[in-house]
Each structure stands twice: as C-alpha cells, then as structure tokens.
C-alpha cells in the first residue's frame, strides 16, 4: 500500500494511506509517522473484514489457489 509522508511546518511528520480515506498519523520522526499510519491502516482493514466487507487492498497479500 502506498503511503504519502511529508514534514509539516512545525517539524512533525504526517503519513497517510490515500487508498484508505482518513487514515493518517503524525509522528515526531518520519519513521514514527510511518509506523503509526501502518498500524492504523491494518486496524481499519481488520475492522472491514470483521464487518464482512471486502478489503481489496489485501488482494496482493493473499491469493486463493
């Protein structure tokens, strides 16, 4: 999943997952922002699956043979 990461004017880092609207996180470092947004993205995808929704973002990770 593609992430967008940028440094804000106040020095904090913002990372977001454009494929999942609203999934964004701040961090004091670039790495911290990435870890936080990855964690949030996984939680959102897990909740979708628990609700019985498809999560096309996972299609590249899992393939039924």
Feature names for model-found ranges:
Residues 1-2, 31-65:
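Short, charged, surface-exposed hinge/linker loops at domain edges
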Residues 5-20:
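Short aromatic-glycine-(Arg/Gly/Cys) micro-motifs in beta-strand/loop hairpins
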Residues 9-10, 28, 59:
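Acidic-enriched, low-complexity/disordered segments with a strong bias for Aspartate over Glutamate
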Residues 11-12, 24, 41:
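A generic structural signal for ordered secondary structure
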Residues 19-22, 57:
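Generic low-complexity segments that are intrinsically disordered, proline-rich and/or Lys/Arg-biased
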Residues 21-32:
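A short, exposed loop/beta-hairpin motif centered on an aromatic-Gly-Thr core
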């Amino acid at each position: 999943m593609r992430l967008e990461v940028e440094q804000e004017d106040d020095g904090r880092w913002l990372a977001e997952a454009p494929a999942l609207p609203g999934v964004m996180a701040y961090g004091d470092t670039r790495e911290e922002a990435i870890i936080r947004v990855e964690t949030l993205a996984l939680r959102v995808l897990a909740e979708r699956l628990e609700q019985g929704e498809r999560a096309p973002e996972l299609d590249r990770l899992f393939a039924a043979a």
